[in-house]
Amino acid sequence: MKQKLHILFVIAVALLGLTACQKSTKDQLVGTWHYVKTMTIDGNTVRIEGTDTNDEDGTYSSVANAVYTFDTEIEGVSVQIKMGVSFKGTGEWTVNDKEIVTTPTSAGVKVTSLKYYDPSDGSFIAELTGNELTETSSAFADELKEGLLEASTEQILVLQENKYVAESTDEDGGKTTCTYNRLK
């Protein structure tokens, strides 16, 4: 009987130790994460590469670069446009069950390049620079900034020590899955 009690006590202590060592989902997400994701918005390709830093106090900072690729016509001529955009943002983050909820408090957007290509063969046509680039892209940058200041939710699909996979759903019901790799 005494031996059975001892075995049960050892098992109970081991289980208690295991549960005491487990980190909460939020604690596991604290750190700096790198991601690359490609998605389609309104039929156009967007490739984003960035870094998010989630702090213990529930704040975050984010920097990213994106390339938007879309086809259009200018004065009856078909062109493919590749627009480079850089983003910066800060805000608050929390975890509810297996969802990451971010509430932005500031966002910055800058169009860094605007290049035109022939869609039939991919050959370079032209590039806007300087004031032309700023004037042409300012309305687009303002619209993007407005969108970045909206709260968002990502469903955590996989959570490991150095990687997590999350899925977001856009307003049209389209889903985007992204893998985040820990930098620190």
Regions found by a protein language model. Give the residues of each.
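Lipid interaction determinants
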Residues: L18-K184
